[in-house]
């Protein structure tokens, strides 16, 4: 009986830990300002709170409706707008949607004789490069900071310290972290969006903002509504990967189609190698 009870408690602990990584808990909402909106455009009208966290389902248009909305508002008010995302691969599309100067074009524009005001007033970068001397002023002086896929952006900071991702050659991991914290603390408006905004993100913001209240905003629709998901746990990463590969092979043998999403190219290659001979497939890196 004691063993069964221990198993139940352990299961509940693991479940609670897993949920913490994918939701904003009621406890976190109670500590701050909380609003539920029916339309994303309503976020632009909210006046309470300097720092906004917007959690809305994937595909609802967070970048276009909220990011572009705050960018256009900044232009009307004569303000500077800077946007961040966690991956360099996403910056081009982000800048295209929000009408920003991409960080990779700074050097070329300076050589062409463009004025700093033209380059940096509306600016977009991946988080790893913000501390470069050519880029940092866009964030040091921005009036509105927009973070796209903010929870992933926070996790990507870890990859700098583990050297899975590099910073700009003229900056360090500590430079990046210090500037990000400084910008979030000092920008007159900070808007962080992510379908996966969670307690981890809230707690990190609390650690750098002290007693400042964050405005948490959610839409009623959640990513994955109507989809059933089974979560498996393993003590070791390789055990989890092997369990997943075994389950995938079983479904392929049954003639089913499988979509596999992974966090790193390395893991993707490893799974692709394990599935050789199991059927036809395509490896997509985006």
Predicted segments with their positions:
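SF2 helicase catalytic motif II
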Residues: 138-192
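Walker A/P-loop
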Residues: 48-69
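Conserved strand-helix element at the start of the C-terminal RecA-like helicase core
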Residues: 79-92, 197-201, 241-276
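Conserved helicase ATPase motor motifs in RecA-like P-loop NTPase domains
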Residues: 54-60, 88, 168-205, 220, ...
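Pre-Walker A adenine-sensing motif
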Residues: 27-48
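Inter-Walker segment of RecA-like/P-loop motor cores
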Residues: 98-139, 286
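Modules that initiate DNA replication and primer synthesis
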Residues: 1-15, 73
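Interdomain hinge/linker at the junction between the two RecA-like core domains of SF2 helicases
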Residues: 199-251
């Amino acid at each position: 009986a004691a063993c069964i009870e221990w198993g139940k408690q352990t299961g509940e602990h693991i479940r609670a830990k897993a949920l913490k990584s994918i939701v904003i808990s009621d406890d976190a909402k109670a500590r701050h300002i909380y609003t539920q909106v029916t339309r994303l455009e309503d976020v632009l009208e909210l006046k309470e709170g300097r720092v906004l966290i917007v959690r809305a389902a994937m595909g609802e248009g967070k970048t276009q409706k909220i990011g572009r909305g705050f960018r256009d508002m900044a232009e009307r008010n004569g303000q500077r707008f800077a946007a961040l995302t966690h991956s360099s691969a996403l910056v081009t599309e982000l800048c295209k949607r929000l009408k920003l100067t991409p960080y990779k074009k700074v050097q070329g524009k300076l050589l062409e004789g463009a004025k700093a005001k033209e380059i940096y007033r509306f600016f977009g970068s991946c988080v790893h490069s913000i501390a470069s001397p050519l880029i940092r002023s866009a964030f040091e002086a921005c009036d509105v900071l927009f973070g796209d896929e903010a929870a992933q952006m926070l996790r990507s900071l870890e990859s700098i310290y583990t050297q899975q991702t590099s910073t700009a050659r003229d900056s360090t991991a500590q430079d990046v972290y210090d500037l990000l914290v400084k910008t979030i603390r000092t920008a007159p408006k900070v808007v962080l969006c992510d379908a996966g905004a969670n307690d981890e993100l809230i707690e990190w913001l609390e650690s750098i903002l002290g007693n400042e209240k964050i405005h948490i905003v959610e839409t009623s629709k959640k990513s994955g509504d109507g989809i059933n998901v089974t979560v498996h746990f393993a003590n070791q990463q390789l055990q989890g990967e092997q369990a997943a590969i075994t389950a995938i092979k079983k479904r392929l043998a049954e003639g089913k189609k499988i979509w596999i999403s992974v966090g790193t190219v390395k893991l993707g290659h490893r799974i692709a190698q394990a599935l050789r001979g199991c059927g036809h497939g395509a490896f997509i890196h985006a």
